[in-house]
């Protein structure tokens, strides 16, 4: 029988880890818990859709990566209608170069086509980007706020993304939060979208996803 310390080492080696403490929002207070995913099984939970790249559940974590043959970033999503909300998720770079965590407008909310915003993270920086309107050739994406930061490969980090009204705040434990706003951010969203960049075999691991209403 494994000792508790040996069991913890095995869990960490396989990919899972102890849940991080809840990060507290600054735009409001947490309301109802809308979603909790611990990825304890060996199959993708209901509500997730893999579109491009690799996506699997193993060792207590969600593994995601880009595939060269797809010719685009690894893309997957979790359906969850929401508006004002707080999203907390743990992530760990395992070779991959970057991740985007995005929200889109629900159908009928805006005339704009494309994403509302993304929190983009690489091992050297992170930002909040407002995306272009794909229906407008003159529209361009722009980083509303960015910061140079180091995120080590093989280390778990906990990210909190808050959205309330026209404001978005992104917090990573131990880092100064990023804050941005836009007149379009207040709309209803159909779920959470993720992108991963990197070479074949390079991954990002995700774990302990929780989403709350933000009041």
Please state what every model-predicted region is:
Residues 180-207:
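Flexible glycan-contacting loops in extracellular carbohydrate-active proteins
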Residues 68-134:
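Secretory/extracellular carbohydrate-interaction modules
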Residues 21-50:
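Extracellular carbohydrate-recognition regions
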Residues 39, 89, 153, 158-181:
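Carbohydrate-binding surfaces in secreted/extracellular proteins
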Residues 53-72:
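Short carbohydrate-recognition loop motifs
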Residues 5-15:
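Bacterial N-terminal signal peptides
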Residues 24-25, 73-80, 145-151, 195-196:
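Beta-strand-rich interaction surfaces with strong enrichment in secreted/lumenal proteins
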Residues 135-158:
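Short, aromatic/His-centered strand-loop micro-motif at the edge of beta-sheets
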